[in-house]
Amino acid sequence: MVINNNISAINAQRTLKFRQVDLKK
């Protein structure tokens, strides 16, 4: 379960990064 939580957190960080890039565009 801890691993799943870590993966979800990493995915959230990735989505935030992609959103920031889109905003920059």
Swiss-Prot record:
Superkingdom, taxonomy of origin: Bacteria
Gene transcribed to yield this protein: flaB1
Primary subcellular site in the record, as a coarse category: periplasm
Family the entry assigns: Belongs to the bacterial flagellin family.
Protein name as annotated: Flagellar filament core protein flaB1
Biological role stated in the UniProt entry: Component of the core of the flagella.
GO CC field: periplasmic flagellum
Protein keywords: Bacterial flagellum, Periplasm
Assembly and binders: The flagellum consists of an outer layer composed of two sheath proteins, flaA1 (44 kDa) and flaA2 (35 kDa) around a core that contains three proteins flaB1 (37 kDa), flaB2 (34 kDa) and flaB3 (32 kDa).
Cellular localization per UniProt: Periplasmic flagellum; Periplasm
